[in-house]
Design a protein with these regions (language model features):
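P-loop NTP-binding module
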Residues: 1-271
Length: 271
């Protein structure tokens, strides 16, 4: 479907960010709740699976898990929290026991498990790192649906164990200070933002200059300017000056690209 096609294109773009290797373990988050991070994570996971990749989707929002609701999966007692907090040594076999197949799609899902009293402590533990390393050896992509960035520190913690983070932005709703705060939270822990998905743009405004009609338009510095994005530039979806604009995204990406350039320069100088 259209959302899967565009999400597949998003991951293709992200794959070319690094000249050495494609991002394999990817955190997906947003500034605040209800901005579309979980549906974006699911669509990305399904599109990659349909393209032939071996994909695992992890529900890491241990406070308000939504994946079982969206995928209409039964709630299972065993999941991520149990693996991290359990006393037994983590192995590929023990991890595989708590994974679930999503229908006949080929997508594997690791649900959140029992709600723990200390999510941040679990996610910052050595066992979570060990789990990620086990999964790296088994899957082409591990997509992690994370909590929103601003209310809790969980996603910043998770992002340090990944190859980077995708931020999901709610068009015409996400505030500039919230986006910048999310960006800074990721940068502060030494992680990187791989890309931004602009989500929830009205379907009747998806009119591209090249004649393509897609859902979920997104900003990756592409050479097209959809009608909806022109409206964002004109602030027609932004009655308040606080609402995230095209210029705010441009400024954010200048900052992110400059940071990556400095990191790459340091890496080359250390060789």
């Amino acid at each position: 479907d259209w959302s899967s096609d565009v999400c597949s294109s998003d991951l293709t773009n992200i794959q070319f960010i690094s000249p050495d290797a494609h991002p394999q373990v990817i955190a997906i988050s947003s500034a605040l709740p209800n901005e579309g991070k979980t549906t974006s994570a699911i669509n990305l996971a399904l599109s990659l699976t349909q393209a032939g990749a071996k994909v695992l989707l992890i529900e890491a929002d241990l406070r308000r898990p939504k994946i079982p609701i969206y995928l209409e999966m039964s709630s299972f007692s065993q999941g991520l929290s149990n693996l991290i907090s359990g006393p037994k040594k983590l192995t590929a076999a023990s991890v595989n026991k708590v994974l679930h197949n999503y229908e006949n799609t080929g997508l594997k899902v690791l649900l959140s498990g029992e709600v723990p009293p200390n999510p941040s402590e679990l996610l910052s533990s050595k066992r979570f790192e060990e789990l990620i390393e086990i999964l790296r050896k088994q899957y082409d992509y591990v997509l992690i649906d994370c909590p929103p960035l601003l209310p809790v520190s969980d996603t910043a913690i998770i992002s340090t164990k990944t190859d980077g983070c995708i931020l999901v932005v709610h068009a015409g709703s996400t505030k500039k200070p919230h986006f910048v705060g999310s960006r800074d939270a990721i940068s502060a822990v030494g992680s990187v933002i791989l890309g931004v998905i602009i989500n929830k743009i009205p379907m009747n405004s998806l009119e591209y200059e090249y004649g393509y009609r897609y859902g979920y338009p997104r900003y990756y510095g592409a050479n097209y300017r959809p009608y909806a994005r022109r409206k964002l530039e004109e602030n027609q979806y932004a009655p308040n000056s606080d609402v995230l604009s095209r210029q705010a995204l441009d400024d954010a990406f200048v900052h992110i690209k400059g940071q990556r350039f400095k990191e790459e320069l340091k890496r080359k100088e250390s060789k």
